[in-house]
A protein has these predicted regions:
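C-terminal motif of bacterial Sec signal peptides marking the signal peptidase cleavage site
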Residues: 25-28
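Sec-dependent N-terminal signal peptides
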Residues: 9-21
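The canonical Cys-X-X-Cys-His
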Residues: 69, 75-85, 139, 174, ...
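Gly/Gly-Pro-rich "capping" loops immediately C-terminal to redox-active cysteine motifs
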Residues: 35-51, 86-138, 154-168, 192-204
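N-terminal secretory signal peptides that target proteins for export/translocation
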Residues: 1-10
């Protein structure tokens, strides 16, 4: 009997708790040492959801700078390409500067059945479809060098070589004006390479002469 009791006590130490039924003990259950007995149980901390990103607020710039930027944008004719419908004389002012679904062929359609086509981008500060994530320096660099994000060089359909002469104050004013526009969510078609068929309409600018 003593040997049996010793074995049960050993098992109790190993397994934590053993309930002994029908044996002459003062208690029916023997508990092993609980290493957490000196600690107080507490409720878990409340988990907070990560707030969703909100639409970017219009950047604050001096009104004189924004006015100058608006003048420069009109002078350079940015809206002719970057406003939907303007390339065919039917501008949709609800999509002012929000990009064009009508593209511009950059290779001669007289020589290429399927010319390469660029669709002017959304240059409002929309975070998803526009330039909402661009800084002032990003915009100025694009104006002067045609270098977009990720070191991507733009085709000269956008006449950035001509814009290289723009002085700092005017370039920053253009950036201020564009960043102060209301963000417009408007996705334009993807550009197509020469030889690929464009799924959206396009125009072509060029000079031609008669062969006769």
């Amino acid at each position: 009997m003593h040997e049996l009791i010793r074995l049960f006590r050993l098992a109790a130490r190993m397994s934590g708790v053993v309930c002994l039924l029908g044996l002459p003990f003062s208690t029916a259950c023997t508990s092993a040492y609980n290493p957490l007995q000196d600690f107080e149980s507490v409720s878990p901390a409340t988990e907070l959801e990560i707030p969703k990103a909100s639409a970017p607020r219009a950047a604050k710039y001096p009104s004189e700078q924004v006015t100058r930027g608006k003048y420069m944008v009109k002078l350079l004719g940015c809206g002719i390409c970057h406003t939907d419908g303007a390339l065919v004389g039917e501008p949709d002012y609800a999509l002012n500067m929000a990009g064009s679904r009508i593209g511009i062929a950059y290779s001669n359609p007289m020589e290429n059945k399927y010319p390469g086509v660029v669709y002017p981008s959304n240059i409002t500060p929309d975070i998803e479809t526009g330039i909402g994530s661009w800084s002032e320096s990003d915009i100025v660099r694009l104006l002067r060098s045609g270098e977009a994000s990720h070191d991507r060089q733009l085709l000269a359909v956008m006449p950035w070589p001509t814009y290289a002469w723009i002085v700092d104050s005017d370039a920053l004013a253009i950036a201020a004006y564009l960043r102060s526009l209301p963000p417009v969510k408007h996705q334009v078609p993807e550009n197509v390479s020469t030889g690929q068929r464009a799924s959206s309409p396009y125009v072509h600018f060029g000079f031609y002469r008669s062969r006769h």
